[in-house]
Curated annotation (Swiss-Prot):
Top-rank taxon: Bacteria
UniProt-annotated catalytic positions: H203, D220, C282
Lipid bilayer topology: Single-pass membrane protein
E.C. designation(s): 3.4.22.-
GO molecular function: cysteine-type deubiquitinase activity; deNEDDylase activity
SUPFAM superfamilies according to UniProt: Cysteine proteinases
Organism annotation: Chlamydia trachomatis serovar L2 (strain ATCC VR-902B / DSM 19102 / 434/Bu)
Biological process, per Gene Ontology: protein deneddylation; protein deubiquitination; proteolysis
Protein name: Deubiquitinase and deneddylase Dub2
Length: 339
């Protein structure tokens, strides 16, 4: 009997596939193209996910964006552009406004300097303007005694009377802070701002009453910071009616009474923003507007002011630099004389 020989057990050997990694430089042309396509595909997918995330975030922030106002990105870009255009322009406050109005009085003679000791706000400016114009009317007809005449602390009653008699253009500046909702709150905010030495949310706007031209002109360098142009027009139309009664038109005995008492014209000097975001140049813009008005009351602001922010800034910077030295003669805040 022959022995049985069992065959040796068979073993399975698995060969591990060899993986060779090559650098992009050493890879074949087909491999390079494949890798580039994959990379671009991943970039596109990543960008899509990012955009989806931003869209979802915008939906979450919809209420916040509605409160803050539209075009936030545009405003941020404008502010960045303003920061990059150069050093900040000087801040012109009430003293600068007074000094410049004195300079204009010396040049044009028919301008009454701005009374900075009697602050105007949106709550009292209509009454204050009417009182000033009524005082001029009574002075013209010698109905006001020297003792009854209210005049600024840095001006004598005699000099103030002479200035009133010779003036026909009356510029008024109004101080505004949007956080104040009453006259008392506005004055308190004004004192706090002056004490802190910071501008905060404060803003200057200009009202020009021209008796000869029979016109009331309002200028806001931010266009709608105090109120919308239409709202300001409605308020000024009430003032225009009062001024028409104080200063009726000249006419003969047979002139129509209603025509003689016709209201002054109302002009909104700016329907676009000329003050760039992030700048505190409202005072300087008020002075520039007054200078242009005295040269030509019918001038068009949009024709004077460049649309490019850098050019607009350069224009105002040139105005400030050429005016500050001449204004310095009135640094004592004493009113100019008519002698």
């Amino acid at each position: 009997m022959e022995p049985i020989h069992n065959p040796p057990p068979q073993t399975c050997s698995y060969s591990r596939p060899s993986t060779t990694y090559t650098s992009f430089k050493d890879a074949s042309c087909d491999t390079k193209v494949t890798r580039i396509i994959i990379a671009l595909f991943l970039i596109v997918i990543s960008c899509g996910l990012i955009l989806c995330a931003y869209t979802f975030r915008d939906l979450l922030d919809a209420d916040y964006l509605a409160q803050e106002g539209p075009q936030q990105a545009t405003k941020l870009l404008q502010q960045l552009d303003d920061v990059l255009t150069g050093p900040p322009l000087p801040i012109w406050d009430n003293e600068h406004l007074f000094q410049f109005s004195c300079l204009m009085q010396n040049k044009h003679r028919r301008v009454l300097p701005i009374d900075i000791c009697n602050p105007l706000t949106k709550f009292n400016f209509l009454e204050c303007i009417c009182n000033c114009l009524m005082t001029k009317q009574s002075v013209n007809v010698n109905e006001t005694d020297m003792c009854e005449l209210f005049c600024p602390p840095t001006c004598t009653p005699e000099n103030y009377r002479r200035l009133l008699c010779t003036s026909s253009v009356f510029p008024f500046v109004m101080w505004h802070d949007p956080s104040a909702d009453t006259q008392e709150a506005m004055l308190t905010k004004m004192d706090q701002t002056m004490s802190s030495g910071r501008v905060g949310n404060s803003h200057w706007v200009l009202v020009i009453v021209d008796i000869e031209y029979r016109c009331v002109t309002f200028f806001d360098s931010l266009c709608d910071y105090v109120a919308s142009p239409q709202q300001m027009r409605e308020q000024l139309e009430g003032l225009a009616v009062s001024l028409g009664a104080i200063y009726p038109k000249e006419g003969g005995a047979d002139s129509d009474q209603e025509e003689l008492l016709s209201p002054f014209q109302v002009r909104i000097g700016s329907t676009v923003k000329v003050q760039s975001p992030g700048e505190f140049t409202c005072g300087a813009w008020c002075c520039q507007f007054l200078a242009w008005y005295l040269e030509n009351p019918d001038f068009d602001l949009e024709e004077k002011v460049p649309t490019n922010p850098s050019e607009r800034r350069a224009l105002l910077a040139d105005f400030i630099s050429t005016t500050e030295q001449a204004m310095s003669r009135y640094s004592s805040l004493s009113w100019p004389t008519t002698d």
